[in-house]
From Swiss-Prot:
FAD binds at residues 154-163, 187-189, 299, 310, 367-371, 396-398. This is Isovaleryl-CoA dehydrogenase, mitochondrial. The keyword Mitochondrion applies. It comes from the Eukaryota.
């Protein structure tokens, strides 16, 4: 494990042992999921997120903007959270997806919006560059993305091409020295602020899935602009917009992977995208319990805390088991990916399960708080609105079910 995290975590742990203190930000029953180093990493990230991200969560949601008064990207970069799976030669930690999922969970626990933007930056953009970029591309783009100096994004979907990626209309015409892009991309997370974007466009409109190519787009390229920032139901502080390409020239060296192999680039990273993003709803479920448990212990009706009533205990038990089963599934799949086995049906399965359970857990959190749960002074409404995104983004629940069913059928 990276020495920076070891030093911070061990020092923190020794301090608590000496002073007989319990970890302030520990999650429930992780002893079966992590070794000591992984637990220390989780605790270290949890403390960072609760101190630096959680205090801004309400304002992020209310103002519909990623924080402007504090540079969270630089803070996360300084804490080495932006290059967890990146090889050390490019400035990363050289760790696996289990550690990446831990960080994504704890950041999402502090703020769903920041968690989603973090996932888009580190997994959709950085991970695609690591997996498919040339040495020169990695040297050029990764250091600034890992430090937080630059923000990353990925753009695949279009107004009329979501799950049906091959139907995209954005074109890339070959010219001397590169390509000229024309078209639009929709629902691009981090789009308004990103300096480095992975964008998919058709280089051969007659070749179907073999006619799509991935490009590295830089903010400021002539002909590239961002349109309106979208006003979303949830994940409001995760800035999202439409991208516009009007005769945008992209040099040949900015092709990511091979020409005509864009679908391979996309699909080869999609399983890992689903895995890492599945940490988001797990973090939201933890946030729900962080609010509900103290509330039902303090809130009194009929002369005693409502947490003593069996109906409330039943709801809390359901929330807890939903979270823990999703968490166990998540880290089991992450561990398998780190061992070299990337299972498509389980990467789809873990986000399908976690996303739908997170929506239900958030609904139960609102119910446990009663009237207060329906008031925006409390964060439970935000949890629900944020959780719902994960049933839609990175492939809808319906697409995930189709993938799982198809893979199971192929195995017979």
């Amino acid at each position: 494990m990276h020495k920076l995290f070891v030093a911070r975590s061990v020092k923190s742990a020794l301090f608590r042992i000496k002073n007989h203190q319990k970890p302030q930000f520990a999650a429930f029953s992780t002893s079966l999921l992590f070794d000591d180093t992984q637990k220390q990493f989780k605790e270290s990230v949890a403390q960072f997120a609760q101190e630096n991200i959680a205090p801004h969560a309400e304002k992020i949601d209310r103002t519909n903007y990623f924080p402007q008064d504090v540079n969270l990207w630089k803070l996360m970069g300084n804490f080495n959270l932006l290059g967890i799976t990146v090889p050390e030669e490019y400035g990363g930690l050289g760790l696996g997806y289990l550690y990446h999922c831990i960080a994504m969970e704890e950041i999402s626990r502090a703020s769903g919006s920041v968690g989603l933007s973090y996932g888009a930056h580190t997994n959709l953009c950085i991970n695609q560059l690591v997996r498919n970029g040339t040495h020169e591309q990695k040297q050029k783009y990764l250091p600034k993305l890992i430090s937080g100096e630059h923000v990353g994004a990925l753009a695949m979907s279009e107004p009329n091409a979501g799950s049906d990626v091959v139907s995209m209309k954005c074109k890339a015409d070959r010219v001397e020295g590169g390509y000229v892009l024309n078209g639009n991309k929709m629902w691009c997370t981090n789009g308004p602020t990103a300096q480095t974007l992975v964008v998919y466009a058709k280089t051969d409109v007659t070749a179907g899935s073999k006619g799509i190519t991935a490009f590295i787009i830089e903010k400021g390229m002539t002909g590239f602009s961002t349109a309106q920032k979208l006003d979303k139901l949830g994940m409001r502080g995760s800035d999202t917009c439409e991208l516009v390409f009007e005769n945008c020239f992209v040099p040949e060296e900015n092709v990511l992977g091979q020409v005509g192999r864009g679908v391979y680039v996309l699909m080869s990273g999609l399983d890992l995208e689903r895995l890492v993003l599945a940490s988001g709803p797990v973090g939201i479920m933890q946030a729900c319990l962080d609010v509900v448990l103290p509330y039902v212990k303090q809130r009194e009706q009929f002369g005693r805390p409502i947490g003593e009533f069996q109906f409330v205990q039943g709801k809390v038990a359901d929330m807890y088991t939903s979270m823990q089963s999703s968490r166990s599934y998540l880290y089991s799949v992450a561990r398998e990916c780190d061992s070299g086995t990337i299972n498509t049906k389980d990467c789809a399965g873990v986000i399908l399960s976690a996303a739908e359970r997170a929506t239900q857990v958030a609904l139960q959190a609102i119910q446990c708080l009663g009237g207060n749960g329906y008031v925006n002074e409390y964060p439970t409404g935000r949890f629900l609105r944020d959780a719902k995104l994960y049933e839609i983004g990175a492939g809808t629940s319906e697409i995930r079910r189709m993938i799982i069913g198809r893979e199971l059928f192929k195995e017979q």
